[in-house]
Amino acid sequence: MKLFILPILLSATTALASPIVGTWHCVGSDENIHSDTKVEYLQDGSFRGDAKLKVDDDGNVLAYHVVGRGKWRFANNALTQSQIKYSEVSRLHSPETLAWLEESEDGQFLESMIYTGLVAQMDKPGEDEVYQLDKTGKLVSEDGTAREVCTKVK
């Protein structure tokens, strides 16, 4: 009986002691895409993210709101998010962007492609995302031209 309780106690202690549990603010960029995200990491190993994404197409900004959930684990100063699924995707376009979309077929095509891609992630989990905890206590993810930095806020 004691052998079964020990792993449960150890995993509970690890989650409670994890520097990841709490609320984080993340800012990311990848060429013409910018994100501003609030992520809540819970002790049970799950997380919920609420993001605003902006895509700049020569001054015309397409904006979206995305809410997602998934699982997380932290080992060797690396945070891995897995089973990431979007539960909500909505458009946040400005009146200026809406006017541009009414007149631009290329803009309509781009907007449709982006929105369809985001909605597609509601049906199936996305790829794992990995962040490194740096010396300053920030989570950093870099992949080619993409970079995201997260700061713990509480």
Question: Residue locations for each model-derived region?
Answer:
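Sec-dependent N-terminal signal peptides
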Residues: 2-14
